[in-house]
Structures are given as C-alpha cells and as structure tokens.
C-alpha cells in the first residue's frame, strides 16, 4: 500500500511536472507570438511611415544643405554673408547707373553682449567636468611641460639667429565657444519697394534677377541665405532700411523666415521720415562667424573687387571688442566710367532642353508655331523659321497652334534644334568690365611696373555667349614672387578651389612665360582673367571654379593671356635695350679717365722726342703735338672730348630707339609755361588751324 501510495505520489509528481512544463511552453509560445505580433506591428508602422509623402520647402532644403550656397562653416559663412551683401549692393547701384558707394561693417559681438541682446542671463558653471574645455590637473601639467620645452627651443633658436615660430594655439575637442558678428552693408542703389521687402528677403527662390542675363549671383539666394544662417546660428531677424529715389520716407523692416513654409515672418514693417532724401538700402544681420580663419579671404575679396570695379568706392571696417584689432580700409574710386547694364536676352535654339521648350510654350503670348519660333528665340528669322517648320514634317505648319503641340511633336522640335545650324548669339547682352576699367583697377590696387590688358571678341559655348578679359602685371606692391592669379566670373572674385580652375591651369601649364622674357619664379606676376557670360559653367556644388574641360573657354583664356604676354614682351625688350644702353654709357664713362690719361701720356712721349728722331706727321698732327707741349691740350681736354662723344652716341641711339618705338609718330603739342606776373614782347595771330607768334 505504501508502495502504491509511493507510485501514486510519483505518478502525481510526474503529472505535475508535465503540466508545469506544458504551461511554461505555452507561456513561451504566447510570448513569442506577442513578440512576433509586436515586430510585425512595428514593421507595418515603419512601412506606413515610410510610405507617407513628405515635402520640403526651398528654405528647408538650403538650410539642410547650406554648404551648397557657401555656408560650410562659421568662417566661410561670415565671408559668404559679406560677399552676398556687397554684390547685391553693386547690382542695385548699377541698375540705376549710379556710381556705387558701399560701406561694409563687420562688428564683433561678445558672448555676454549677445546674451544681453536676446535676454539671456549669463550663468556660472557648476559642473566644470561637463565642459569641453575642462582640463584635469594631469593634462594641465602635461601642457605646461610641453609649453616650457617649446619656449626653451625657441630661446635656443633665437640665440643662434634662427627663425622663431609662434606658439601653436590650443585647440579644444569640440566646436568651442561660438563667436558672433553683426554684418552691415549700406549702398546708394535703387532701394526696394516698401510692400515687396518681406517677399524679396524672406522667401527663398524669389527675386528680380531670374531670367537669361549676365548676373553676379550664383544661386539667386543673396541675403536670403544669410538670413537662413542667422536663423540657424543666432535666431535673430534681419533688419532692412530702404528708400527709393524721390521717396520722402525710409522703409524699415525687421523680419525672419519660416524655414518649413518658406514665407517671411515680419516682426516690424513701417515707414520712417527721410530727412536727407537718401536712397539705397542698408541690411544688418547678426550671425555666427569666425573672423580669425577667414580674415585674409575677406580682405582679398575686397581688394579683388576693387580691381574689377574701379568705378566703385568701398569703405570696409572691422570693429573688435579690442580696439587695437580694429581695421578700416578704404578702396577709393578711380574712374566714373561704368560698364553697360547687362541686358536680358532670348534663348538660343541650341541651348534649350525639352523642359525649357514646354515652359516657353506655356508662357508665350504667340498663337502659332511660326510666331513662336520667330519671337521666342534669337537668330531665327521668319524665313529660317519657315524652313525649320518644313523640316519638322507633315504634322507641322506655320499656323499650328503652339498650345496644341503634343509631347511627340515637342520632342521633334527639340531634336531639330540640336541638329540644325544656327548663327552664334552676339555678345551685345553681356557687360564686361572693359579693358580701361581692368587696367585702371590693376594700377590702382597693385601699382605695377608694367601692365597689359586684352579683351576677346564674343565667343560661344553651348549656345551661350561669353567674353574673356585678361590682364598681366609685372611688379607692384603686396605681390608675391611668381604667379599671383586673380579669377573672376561675371565680375565677382573666385577665391576657393583655385587648383582645378581653367584660369589657373592655363596660366601654369599652357603659357611659356620664358619665351616672353618673363621669369615665372622670380618676377612678381599678376594674372587677371575675367569671364562674363549668360551662363557660367561652374563646377562643384559650391560653384567656386570653372572646369578645365571646356575647350572653347580654355582656348579663349589662353589666347587672351598670350596677347597680354606679347604686349609685355615688347615693353620688356625695350626696357632691356634701354638698360643695356645705360649700362654701356656707364661703362664707357668709367673708362674715360684711364683712356684720356693713356692718350695724354703717349702724345707727351711723342712730343718730347727731338724732330730728327720723330716720324713725319701731317700738319694737323704737328699742331696737336705743339698744343700738347704748350699744355694747351691737357688730359682734361681729352676727358671732355670723350665724354661729349659718348653723350652724342647715346643721344643718337636714344633717338633711333624712340623712332623704332613710334614716339616720333605720335602727335606733338607745344607747351608754354608763363608767369602770372610780368609783360611779354610778342604778338600772337590766332587762326582756326595755327597760331603765328611774332617775337620782335
């Protein structure tokens, strides 16, 4: 019985174990089921979320891809902000044919001042180890030891007369503390209509510069991208003052931009009294920046802009928290000759794509195909348009309504445009700086010893006209030895990514400088190339250089530089000849005393000989010997004669040099300097063609 009880107990225990095991398995299965269900639900949620259609506004796109517009980092953002404001100011003044007068101020703002501006109270640190610039005792000891070794090495170098290096600046691990700057740009240009200011500055990809024409801007963003960067880095709005000619009020607007909606957010928009009748615009924005890293780029930009726009006056000021770091530079105006205003032009048939053809059709006011071809494109006359329509096929006629064209017909038009022959577009719509302005700008800023300029005739690349202007200078101030290359596209300086640019590669690899008597390593050579076009073929996302793979542009740049080199070669050769002539004259004058002394000694010995022993001489020789004996002819006499002869030869060579240089062919005009006091004994008889002066 006990055994049976034991067996029963064992059996019951076994059953309980099985039941527990099955319960555990069921629980695990249930948990696994829940896990799978949760995973499936998560996957469905992810799929549903990924299937949602999202949109980004243009402002949001450029905010997330700010490097495209030149806002890679705080330093370059400061440079790009200043550049955009300056170029807008130039465009504004030139649009009303006003000589630009532009003032740029970059003011450094300390962290405490910035916090006060935004109403933020400075807070003392509580947990020092939380901050990136925290330095432990061990790290501090290590740094001080390293600095001591560096100072010891520098002291030894100084004692030995070697170059002493500056101590390296300490670098933090992270971004460090931000630096803020107020950038202000004031001009005397057109100004902006009061009601248009919010949309002109607070809505990305809206403006007045869109169309087929030569423009300074690369993206059409201008100050709008500076406002986006301000929104991202400081959160502060932009302030605008503007007034147009004839207005008795100044428009004041304080606004920022709604990044997600791409619409302006206006804080204040009002009219103020304009007592001085000022016209133009003044923009002020506060951004994060870095003056230290991009100081040289900003100053180089201003100097190069002063070269290409000598008709403009720039006043640049940097205001630091430390007065000893303040900087003021004025780039004075040198001429009042301004380039013509760029004209908007029509598209060349060979430069359009299918999408552009569709847009032109949707915007045209012309009804039939003949009128559309004749009026919406350049270089298509009526007869040419009729020939093109006849070539398109039986489905086309001169009276075909352009709005009714099918997609297949549009493709046919596009294909014919790519295959047909058209005259090249003219460069009348372009606005180059001009040789005169380029030369004046180079002379004004560099003060070179020699300068040559050349402007090419209009040429074409992919249906877009372009003009290349070049200048080369030798010598000058603040110019390094070797090649100093200054690049311009649509009259704005290009400072970044120089190595891959067509201008740089042409100057370095395609010009044999030595054949033009120019020493590429030792001479101070300034190479200036400006390319203007309705479409600059920039490379890279930042549009900082023009590619070297465009044969038409590379050939035009090389030709323009060679023309400048040829001009310089003739000048250099003439200078070398003049220098050789001066050296020859100096060397001859150096030997005159010795030659005169030798001649005098020889003649003295001959004169001392008795007549029977002396050879028979001509009468003139005998007279000379007698003068030597009587000391009527001395060593100084021969010196004077030789000096006079050298002067005569030098004069004849200089006259021949002048005649070869064409100086004698230039018109000459007599100039008279008369005292304001006193009377003169002559009479002038005036005639339309001459003045006859009678001097008694």
From Swiss-Prot:
Swiss-Prot/TrEMBL induction comment: By auxin, abscisic acid (ABA) and benzylaminopurine.
UniProt feature, compositional bias: Low complexity: 20-36
State any GO BP term from the record: response to brassinosteroid
Name where it's found. Answer: Nucleus
**Residues bound to ATP:** 88, 187, 208-209, 217-224, 543
Lipid metabolism is among the record's keywords:
no
One GO molecular-function entry = DNA binding
Domain of life, per lineage: Eukaryota
Q: List its EC numbers.
A: 5.6.2.2
Return the annotated region ranges for Disordered.
1-36
Looking up InterPro entries in the UniProt record yields: HATPase_C_sf (IPR036890), Ribosomal_Su5_D2-typ_SF (IPR020568), Ribsml_uS5_D2-typ_fold_subgr (IPR014721), TopoVI_B (IPR005734), TopoVI_B_transducer (IPR015320)
Tissue specificity field:
Highly expressed in flowers before pollination. Expressed in roots and shoots.
Task: Write out the catalysed reaction.
Answer: ATP-dependent breakage, passage and rejoining of double-stranded DNA
Keywords on record: ATP-binding, DNA-binding, Isomerase, Nucleotide-binding, Nucleus, Topoisomerase
The UniProt entry, under SUPFAM superfamilies, shows:
ATPase domain of HSP90 chaperone/DNA topoisomerase II/histidine kinase, Ribosomal protein S5 domain 2-like
A single GO cellular-component term on record: DNA topoisomerase type II (double strand cut, ATP-hydrolyzing) complex
Q: Which family does it belong to?
A: Belongs to the TOP6B family.
Quaternary arrangement and interactors, per the entry?
Homodimer. Heterotetramer of two TOP6A and two TOP6B subunits. Interacts with SPO11-2 and TOP6A3.
Function noted in UniProt: Component of the DNA topoisomerase VI involved in chromatin organization and progression of endoreduplication cycles. Relaxes both positive and negative superturns and exhibits a strong decatenase activity. The B subunit binds ATP. May be involved in cell proliferation and stress tolerance.
- Report what the protein is called: DNA topoisomerase 6 subunit B
Q: Which organism is it from?
A: Oryza sativa subsp. indica (Rice)
Q: What is the lineage of its organism?
A: Eukaryota, Viridiplantae, Streptophyta, Embryophyta, Tracheophyta
């Amino acid at each position: 019985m006990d055994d049976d009880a034991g067996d029963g107990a064992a059996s019951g225990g076994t059953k309980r174990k099985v039941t527990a095991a099955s319960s555990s398995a069921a629980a695990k299965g249930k948990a696994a089921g829940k896990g799978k269900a949760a995973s499936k639900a998560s996957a469905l949620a992810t799929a549903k979320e990924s299937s949602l259609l999202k949109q980004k506004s243009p402002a949001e796109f450029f905010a997330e891809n700010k490097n495209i517009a030149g806002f890679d980092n705080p330093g370059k953002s400061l440079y790009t902000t200043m550049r955009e404001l300056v170029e807008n100011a130039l465009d504004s003044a030139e649009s009303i044919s006003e000589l630009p007068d532009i003032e740029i101020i970059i003011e450094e703002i300390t962290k405490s001042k910035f916090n006060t501006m935004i109403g933020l109270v400075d807070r003392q640190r509580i947990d020092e180890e939380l901050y990136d610039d925290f330095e432990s005792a061990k790290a501090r000891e290590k740094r001080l030891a390293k600095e001591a070794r560096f100072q010891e090495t520098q002291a030894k170098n100084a004692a030995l007369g070697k170059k002493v290096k500056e101590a390296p600046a300490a670098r933090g691990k992270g971004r460090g503390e931000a630096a803020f700057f107020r950038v202000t740009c004031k001009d005397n240009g057109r100004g902006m209509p009061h009601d248009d200011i919010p949309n002109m500055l607070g809505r990305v990809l809206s403006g007045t510069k869109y169309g087929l024409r030569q423009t300074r801007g690369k993206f059409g963003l201008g100050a709008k991208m500076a406002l986006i960067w301000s929104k991202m880095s400081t959160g502060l709005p932009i302030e605008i003052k503007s007034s147009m000619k004839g207005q008795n009020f100044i428009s004041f607007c304080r606004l920022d931009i709604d990044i997600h909606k791409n619409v302006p957010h206006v804080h204040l928009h009002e009219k103020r009294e304009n007592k001085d009748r000022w016209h133009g615009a003044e923009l002020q924005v506060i951004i994060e920046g870095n003056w230290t890293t991009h100081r040289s780029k900003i100053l180089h930009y201003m100097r190069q802009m002063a070269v290409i726009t000598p008709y403009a006056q720039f006043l640049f000021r940097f205001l630091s928290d430390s007065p000893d770091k303040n900087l003021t530079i004025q780039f004075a105006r040198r001429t009042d000759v301004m380039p013509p205003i760029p004209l908007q032009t029509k598209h060349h048939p060979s430069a359009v794509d299918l999408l552009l053809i569709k847009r032109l059709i949707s915007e045209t006011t012309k009804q039939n195909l003949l009128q559309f071809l004749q009026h919406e494109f350049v270089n298509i006359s009526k007869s040419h348009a009729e020939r093109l329509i006849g070539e398109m096929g039986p489905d086309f006629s001169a009276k075909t309504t352009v709005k009714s064209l099918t997609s297949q017909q549009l493709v046919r038009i596009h294909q014919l445009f790519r295959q047909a022959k058209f005259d090249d577009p003219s460069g009348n719509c372009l606005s180059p700086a001009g040789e005169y302005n380029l030369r004046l700008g180079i002379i004004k800023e560099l003060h070179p010893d020699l300068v040559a300029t050349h402007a090419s005739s209009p040429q074409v690349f992919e249906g877009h006209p372009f003009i290349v202007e070049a200048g080369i200078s030798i010598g000058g101030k603040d110019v390094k030895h070797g090649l100093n290359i200054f690049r311009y596209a649509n009259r704005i300086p290009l400072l970044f990514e120089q190595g891959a640019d067509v201008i740089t590669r042409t100057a370095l690899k395609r010009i044999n400088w030595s054949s033009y008597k120019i020493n590429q390593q030792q001479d101070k050579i300034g190479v200036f190339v400006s390319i203007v076009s309705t479409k600059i073929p920039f490379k890279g996302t930042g549009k900082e250089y023009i590619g070297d793979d465009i044969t038409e542009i590379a050939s035009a740049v090389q030709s323009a530089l060679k023309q400048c080199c040829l001009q310089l070669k003739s000048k250099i050769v003439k200078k070398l000849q003049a220098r050789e002539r001066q050296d020859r004259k100096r060397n001859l004058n150096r030997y005159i005393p010795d030659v005169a002394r030798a001649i005098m000694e020889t003649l003295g010995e001959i004169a001392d000989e008795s007549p029977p022993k002396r050879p028979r001489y001509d009468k003139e020789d005998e007279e000379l010997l007698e003068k030597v004996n009587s000391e009527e002819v001395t060593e100084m006499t021969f010196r004077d004669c030789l000096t006079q002869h050298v002067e005569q030869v030098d004069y004849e060579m200089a006259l021949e040099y002048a005649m070869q240089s064409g100086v004698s062919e230039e018109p000459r005009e007599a100039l008279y300097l008369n005292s304001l006091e006193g009377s003169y004994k002559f009479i002038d008889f005036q005639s339309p063609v001459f003045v006859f002066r009678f001097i008694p």
